[in-house]
Design a protein with these regions (language model features):
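P-loop NTPase catalytic phosphate-binding loop
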Residues: 1-107, 125, 130-197, 201-215, ...
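Charged, glycine/proline-rich intrinsically disordered loops and linkers
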Residues: 68, 117-118
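Residues that form generic nucleotide/phosphate-binding pockets
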Residues: 93, 115, 206, 245-248
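Short secondary-structure junctions and interdomain/linker hinges
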Residues: 97, 119, 213, 252-259
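Short glycine-rich substrate-engagement loop in P-loop NTPases that contacts/grips substrate
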Residues: 106-117
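Conserved alpha/beta core segments of nucleic-acid transaction machinery
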Residues: 225-277
Length: 277
């Protein structure tokens, strides 16, 4: 029996589990299923990978499915400072999209894109087809430890406001402790996945219920969605398979470059510079 949920209805997903219990495999399963379903014009990924190696396989589909900051070489973000810039750029993208929706008189991205494809919106006024953007963060705890509030604020903003304009967040973390998954973040991530965690407290933090500490491991998971908790076995997508899928997509003709996010200028850094020099 397959369990399939639309990410757009979720609208954001929080995953937690101890090391080696299938979190990264679960992420890969989600990413690959999205790659299968959507055309590059409909979907872009922003991949944040503090571990540096987990998501590097997706580098070959940069010109098809990835989004990045202007002027960056790497489309997969591993550096904490760049993560902060990217999150803020996503917030700018969100505000821009809301302006477009307001102009078009639409309430969500689906209505907007339907209107646009029906040629009811003028591209000369800046209207364009808006792809879904999925932000994937593979080790959230690491970001919070190194950047703290700077990361948490934009993520909380995106989680609160970005669902209507097609920006969705998938966040994975090893340590679901209270100082990492704060109340603000929990409130905005109604869909949660827990792989095996080390203690009952961790299970309560992520699912608001015990049970995740008794899972077997190896992709055995609890999904909390719509107020119900379901026990599932996560599909196993190994590295060669992800590689093959990415390779296949990468060999097709893509766009000239990755999807560019708006430019973000850090005001604090601007103050430090002297423009006359």
């Amino acid at each position: 029996d397959n369990f399939i949920v639309d990410l757009a209805t979720m609208p954001h997903l929080l995953m937690a589990g101890a090391t080696g219990q299938g979190k990264s495999v679960g992420l890969n399963a989600i990413l690959v299923s999205l790659l299968y379903k959507k055309h590059p014009s409909q979907l872009k990924f922003v991949l944040v990978d503090p571990k540096k190696v987990e998501l590097s396989l997706y580098r070959v589909i940069e010109k098809h499915f990835l989004a990045k900051l202007p002027g960056e070489e790497e489309s997969i973000i591993t550096d904490t400072k760049k993560v902060v810039y990217t999150l803020n750029a996503l917030c700018i993208e969100m505000d821009n999209r809301y302006d477009l929706l307001k102009e078009a008189g639409c309430r969500n991205i689906k209505e907007y894109n339907e209107k646009f494809t029906a040629r009811k919106l003028n591209p000369e006024k800046g209207h364009q087809y808006l792809p879904f953007i999925v932000l994937v963060v593979d080790e959230f705890a690491d970001l919070i430890m190194t950047a703290g509030k700077e990361v948490e604020m934009p993520i909380a903003r995106l989680a609160q406001l970005a669902r209507a304009i097609g920006i969705h967040l998938i966040i994975a973390t090893q340590r679901p402790s209270v100082n990492i998954i704060t109340g603000t973040i929990k409130a905005n991530f109604p869909a949660r996945i827990a792989f095996k965690v080390s203690s009952k407290i961790d299970s309560r933090t992520i699912l608001d219920a015990g049970g995740a500490e008794q899972l077997i491991g190896k992709g055995d998971m609890l999904v909390s969605y719509n107020g119900e908790i379901t026990r599932l076995q996560c599909a196993f997508v190994d590295t060669p398979e992800v590689d093959a899928v990415c390779e296949f997509i990468g060999n097709q003709k893509g766009y000239p470059q990755a999807f560019l996010l708006p430019e973000y200028v850090d005001e604090k850094e601007m103050e430090g510079r002297d423009f006359d020099a």
